[in-house]
Swiss-Prot record:
Oligomeric and partner information: Component of the toroidal 9-1-1 (RAD9-RAD1-HUS1) complex, composed of RAD9A, RAD1 and HUS1. The 9-1-1 complex associates with LIG1, POLB, FEN1, RAD17, HDAC1, RPA1 and RPA2. The 9-1-1 complex associates with the RAD17-RFC complex. RAD9A interacts with BCL2L1, FEN1, RAD9B, ABL1, RPA1, ATAD5 and RPA2. Interacts with DNAJC7. Interacts (when phosphorylated) with TOPBP1.
Catalytic activity, as annotated: Exonucleolytic cleavage in the 3'- to 5'-direction to yield nucleoside 5'-phosphates
Residues bearing PTM Phosphoserine: S272, S277, S328, S341, S375, S380, S387
Entry protein name: Cell cycle checkpoint control protein RAD9A
One GO MF term attached to the UniProt entry: 3'-5' exonuclease activity
Name of encoding gene: RAD9A
Region (Possesses 3'-5' exonuclease activity): 51-91
Length: 391
């Protein structure tokens, strides 16, 4: 086998290798009559990827010499990735790339012809192997989305790089929703922030899916395919079925085809039933346990409803000690105690009978302005001696 890649196609080949490196540790290289096939699969057999470069992609392509059988080989991904490690270098200095496969020496030779007559030769050892092929049929999937890779790439940009899985579903109004997925038994601190992105139907070239369907798959492999498709300015098609069935991601061009098959989780029903509705995250049952206001009462945005909502959101924290923050008002002129003020102080506790939660948080958060502050540190120090007139 011998092929020659020139011009900008060298960088395209390098980007494809980078995308495959996100999935597997071994690269299966197979010359075919239809083109050069690069495939990989992860160790758990839950992700499979394949790129098929047509003969027109190469300036020169020969699958096998006359009278010789087609060779199939398997090499380490790190070894082949080291040839295309720097994409910037490929674009600026490499003019053409020659790949040859010699079965007698068991070597895969990759030559990079750079500017100023510089040549870099990589001799990679390989192993003979059988053909790696996954069984899948995109036409059998009832749901399909097609959109420019740039649109989907911008949609996954806000998600954390440490996020493992993402949920893709169809919400109300036929909106396509991407939401971060966290396992139920995971630490509560990891679920503190949920990222969700919504795309309108007009952003897709084709949207053939029912409302309420959703699948959850690995985000790392999905980003690898998006990175390649976006750099090549290609459209991405997503074919999927029910949760638990594999999802198929395809890109197609006159010079290359790409297929990524990713496993999906089978327990996403509880996460997708209210996809796109933020009301499911509000602690409404806890609020009704303390008071049963009219549904329109919270539209007034008064201080009592605000403090009730605060009480329900942090009520589960128990007896955790809150940090003390000094918010005492500035110096005020002393007021002489009078009978009128004493009557007001005695009448003040009776103004909120039967509403312990609001009274509790009023004294906790707003006690410095709504109630007299009683310092537990004892009497304040005497700053001036008593006058002689007072006995």
């Amino acid at each position: 086998m011998k092929c020659l890649v020139t011009g900008g196609n060298v960088k395209v080949l390098g980007k494809a290798v980078h995308s495959l490196s996100r999935i597997g540790d071994e690269l299966y290289l197979e010359p075919l009559e239809d083109g050069l096939s690069l495939r990989t699969v992860n160790s758990s057999r839950s992700a499979y990827a394949c790129f098929l470069f047509a003969p027109l992609f190469f300036q020169q392509y020969q699958a096998a010499t006359p009278g010789q059988d087609l060779l199939r080989c398997k090499i380490l991904m790190k070894s082949f990735l080291s040839v295309f490690r720097s994409l910037a270098m490929l674009e600026k200095t490499v003019e053409k790339c020659c790949i040859s496969l010699n079965g007698r020496s068991s070597r895969l030779v990759v030559q990079l012809h750079c500017k100023f007559g510089v040549r870099k030769t990589h001799n990679l050892s390989f192993q003979d192997c059988e053909s790696l092929q996954a069984v899948f049929d995109p036409a059998s999937c009832p749901h399909m989305l097609r959109a420019p890779a740039r649109v989907l790439g911008e949609a996954v940009l806000p998600f954390s790089p440490a996020l493992a899985e993402v949920t893709l579903g169809i919400g109300r109004g036929r909106r396509v929703i991407l939401r971060s997925y966290h396992e139920e038994e995971a630490d509560s601190t990891a679920k503190a922030m949920v990222t969700e992105m919504c795309l309108g139907e007009e952003d897709f070239q084709q949207l053939q899916a029912q409302e309420g369907v959703a699948i959850t798959f690995c985000l790392k492999e999905f980003r690898g395919l998006l990175s390649f498709a976006e750099s090549a300015n290609l459209n991405l098609s997503i074919h999927f079925d029910a949760p638990g069935r594999p999802a198929i991601f395809t890109i197609k061009d006159s010079l290359l085809d790409g297929h990524f098959v990713l496993a999906t989780l089978s327990d996403t029903d509880s996460h997708s039933q209210d996809l796109g509705s933020p009301e499911r995250h509000q602690p409404v049952p806890q609020l009704q346990a303390h008071s049963t206001p009219h549904p329109d009462d919270f539209a007034n945005d008064d201080i009592d409803s605000y403090m009730i909502a605060m009480e329900t959101t942090i009520g589960n924290e128990g007896s955790r000690v809150l940090p003390s923050i000094s918010l005492s008002p500035g110096p005020q002129p002393p007021k002489s105690p009078g009978p009128h003020s004493e009557e007001e102080d005695e009448a003040e506790p009776s103004t909120v009978p039967g509403t312990p939660p609001p009274k509790k948080f009023r004294s906790l958060f707003f006690g410095s302005i709504l109630a007299p502050v009683r310092s537990p540190q004892g009497p304040s120090p005497v700053l001036a001696e008593d006058s002689e007139g007072e006995g």
